[in-house]
């Protein structure tokens, strides 16, 4: 289940979701949020997971604000959720996942000027010790999705396709761990 970034349409993550589905053989659900803000429905994954009762193991994740909400959801979720993907995101101060047993991957573009890097680093203290971190060299904030440039973001020095290829590879590695 993938939560979109704040004020970003879920369809903006369709290329990423499609690549995960095709390359990983996994079903991917893009969560539609009220006003395109996951903060208004952080529990949206419940309905998506309940609609697919044949799937026993789930990973939740999200981009930016959607990632913070996915982390909060993962903290309080049932045992169906086994992993967490954070794309240019970190858990809120109130979200403690260090002892959660979740498999986690956290990705950030080296040119991301939207995420406050010291706060991202502090968020790592609330994640499991075996969290996999990947800084995508040349990547930025917006290229985790397909919604164009984002005000305040850095200029990517790699293509969106390259950034998403690296993102998919990291997510597929996580899928292999659960």
Identify what each model region corresponds to.
Residues 1-23:
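Short, surface-exposed "cap/lid" segments of acyl-processing enzymes
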Residues 17-38:
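Conserved alpha/beta-hydrolase
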Residues 22, 108-162:
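Active-site-adjacent alpha-helix of alpha/beta-hydrolase-fold enzymes
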Residues 33-34, 85-93, 109-113, 139:
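Active-site nucleophile loop of the alpha/beta-hydrolase fold
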Residues 43-57:
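Conserved acidic catalytic loop of the alpha/beta-hydrolase fold
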Residues 62-70:
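Gly/Ala-rich beta-loop-alpha elbow adjacent to hydrolase catalytic centers
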Residues 100, 106-108:
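Short beta-strand/loop motif that positions the catalytic acidic residue
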